[in-house]
Structures are given as C-alpha cells and as structure tokens.
Amino acid sequence: MNISELKSKFTSISKLKKGGQKTVYKASDFNGQVVALKIIGNATDPRVLQEISILKELALNNIPKIIDSGTVTDEMINEDALFIIEQFINGISLRDWLNEGNKANISTAFKILHTLLLIEIELEKNNILHRDINPNNIILGDNGAIYLIDFGLAKKLGDSSLTQTAATYGPFTPGYAPHEQFANIKLAQDVRTDLFQIGVTIYECCTGTNPFIKLNDTPYQIMTKTMTLMPPTLILKGDAKGMFAHYINMLMAKNQSQRPDTAYDALRYLNAIKSTLKLED
C-alpha cells in the first residue's frame, strides 16, 4: 500500500502540521470516526518504532490511543514510511494556550499538575519514562480533560538504550530536561526526571515564561541555567502560605534526591497541601 492508497481510506483529510520527517493529518474514516493520521518518512526510525510499541502497551484515558500502524510506500521517492492512526483529540496545546497570553491560576495549575501526576503514576507502573513533558506535548481537551502526547523520547526502563553511552548529550528538550537527562547519565534517569519536567511546565503555566529560557539563548546557555539558576519563587493568588510554590520548587530541585522518589509520593505531597490552597470549584 502506498500513501495515496492509505489516504483514500478516509472521506476527508487535512494537513495539521509538518515537522522534520513527520506529517500529521486530521482525517475522517467511512464510519465517521475522526482520527489523527501521522506519516513518518523513515520506516526504520527506532524511536518511532519504540513510541508505537509503548503506546500500544498503554491504555490510559489521558493518552491518545493507537488505532492502527504499519508501513506504507512513499511513491514520490519509492521508499517505505511509517503510518500511525490514533485517537484525535479536540483541543488546544498548552503551548498555544500560553502563546495566546493566558496564564494559569492556582486552580488551573492544580488541575493540570494533578492530572500529569496521575498519568505519571501509570507510566511508572509500566516502567516508562516520557522524558519530554512540556507545553507542546500537553493538550487541553475541549471536553475539559488533559492529555499527554508525543512519546518520541520515551524510554522503557530496562530496555537497551537508543543513545550511545559515550554520547555527550542524550535526547532532550532544552529548558525542560534536568541535568541527568541532557548529560546522558542513563542510570540516573527515572521518574524524578519526568517530575522535574512537570515542575518546569507548571511554573511556566503560572508565569507565562520558562525560567531557564530567554530569547536567543543557545542550548548550552539553557543547560547551564538549568543546572545553576534558582527560579524566582512563584507568587500565586490562592497560595497564601506559599505551599504550592514550595512544592513546585521541590519538583524542580537540581539535586535529584531532593525531588519526590515516586510519582505516587509526589501526588501524596500535593494532596497534603491541597487544604492550604484556595481552589475554585
């Protein structure tokens, strides 16, 4: 089957975005189901194959489900490509929401944080690290739900690594990855790596800016600030005792040992401070 034949299986199809070797479409099949169709240029890309494997293993309401996947021929260049058909999420990315000038109040921040921790608990049960939690990969659904997407950097703990041990840097998104990730310290990467990223993401939700990124910063400058800069403490209406701000600082701790040991611990700590927060219903 080639790409044109694959597209013919849908009654309507429109391109949403293209980046690198991946093109994403919104499509409707003959049963009226709306799906996301992804076509990736390299059919042997190990990270994409790993992402497919991980997503097929997971069955969580807050992660888009894979409906089908396989290999298809790109007739333009006569080479194989991968395709993924997955659940389509109506909504807006957290990145686009922030780019519209929005900032999260204490209630919205708590909801996003609480949902991400529930997802992280399930990932931890399955020995999976996402490793790329940031506003680009969080969808605020039109139905009020919050979704975590893009498992392209995800890692199954215990599996062989796709990055050479001798490599100076591991795969990461600057400004969100902690030191143990971008420095490619493989044995140190665990759930606390994801918790750091969650902390930075929530901080950015509340302030509108990533504390480690300024315009025109190089990746090296961002990494240096991630290791050395202590972000200004959050000041949020509804956090009179500063417990939420302290909690976010704990997630963003430079020293891994100062972050919660597990996602469950992180959720337990969050629930323990909930009574100090003035949350809207």
Please state what every model-predicted region is.
Residues 45-57:
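AlphaC helix of the eukaryotic protein kinase fold
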Residues 120, 124-140:
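Catalytic-loop of the protein kinase fold
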Residues 65-82:
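Short beta-strand micro-motifs within the conserved protein kinase catalytic domain, predominantly
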